[in-house]
Amino acid sequence: MGIFRWNYPESSVPGVWGETTSTIDWCEENYVVSPYIAEWSNTLTNSVFILSAIYTTYSAYKNKLEKRFLLIGFGYGLVGVGSWLFHMTLKYRFQLLDELPMIYAMCIPTWSLVCEAKEALLNGDNHKKVPLFEQIFIGVIIGLAVTTASILYVIYKNVDIHQILFGVQIVVVAATAGSLTYRYVHDPLAKRNLKASMALGAILFLSGYISWLLDIHYCSFWVHVRRSILALPLGVLLEPHGWWHILTGMGIYFYIVSLEHLRVITLNVSCNYQFIWRWKVFPELIWKGRKPSTRYSLELFGPYVEDQSIEVKKEK
């Protein structure tokens, strides 16, 4: 068809990883781009997930946030790596490395928010940390519930168990964070920033979920368009499951930043931090002693903080 456009192969292409052993094989056709990567788009799009997790962890460390946020970043990074290996090989062992870390990574924000909700209910606006023993107890209960569900999933290989548990965790995190923001965040700017970051995170995540559903239910349509109209390499852009990775990777970043901001507010240490929007759209919670290295605003799509941008230019 041309140097920069070529047809999909007519028959299945063998790959270096051998026979597929995973219980799920997504709509993307296998080994059509490289014999080393079973699902090209579904693999490479995990780079968004991995990079956002790395930056989340780095930012939490550099800005002196609690270790729980380092664990959250590490957990989601592990999900990205597991998903990369799964889509690259379509092996069952890597499928588990993709799916199980999803629910275990969600345990950390679930545990954190349950503890925060208890702190808020007991102390009102004078927040004190839940005693360490109670934090451990809550974590053990959540961990046991997830471990039990994981064992059942591995035994019965019923993907509904994994998906239902993951959905329940998302609802708990979103509902608890929203309730805490509504009831206990009084500063108007902080509340606007929390709502904006949570809303964008939710919109991105839901958009990713829609892409995930479209990949499952309209696979034959996507295959037809890719083969008959787009061909390669443009066809790799029309992989809805790959867009699930991109959109959820971005959405989770937005939501983690909002959870960080909510946490410092409930601990009454928000005076030590500043919530900024890099280039007016990417949120980050930074230590007040730090000077942002990019232009930023204090609200979503708000005006740039000009005096800071001048300082940054002088430093350069």
From Swiss-Prot:
Record-annotated membrane-spanning stretches: 94-114, 136-156, 229-249
Function, as annotated: Alkaline ceramidase that hydrolyzes phytoceramide and also dihydroceramide into phytosphingosine or dihydrosphingosine. Prefers phytoceramide. Also has reverse activity as acyl-CoA-independent ceramide synthase, catalyzing synthesis of phytoceramide and dihydroceramide from palmitic acid and phytosphingosine or dihydrosphingosine. Is not responsible for the breakdown of unsaturated ceramide.
Entry membrane topology: Multi-pass membrane protein
Subcellular location: Endoplasmic reticulum membrane
Annotated catalysed reactions: N-hexanoyl-sphinganine + H2O = hexanoate + sphinganine; sphinganine + hexadecanoate = N-hexadecanoylsphinganine + H2O; N-hexadecanoyl-(4R)-hydroxysphinganine + H2O = (4R)-hydroxysphinganine + hexadecanoate; N-hexadecanoylsphing-4-enine + H2O = sphing-4-enine + hexadecanoate
Protein name: Alkaline ceramidase YPC1
Enzyme class: hydrolase
Principal subcellular localisation of the protein: endoplasmic reticulum
Keywords: Disulfide bond, Endoplasmic reticulum, Hydrolase, Membrane, Transmembrane, Transmembrane helix
Disulfide bond entries: C27-C219
GO molecular function (one): sphingosine N-acyltransferase activity
GO CC terms of this entry: cortical endoplasmic reticulum; endoplasmic reticulum; endoplasmic reticulum membrane
Intramembrane segments: 37-57, 69-89, 161-181, 196-216
Gene name for this UniProt entry: YPC1
Organism of origin: Saccharomyces cerevisiae (strain ATCC 204508 / S288c) (Baker's yeast)
Superkingdom of the source species: Eukaryota
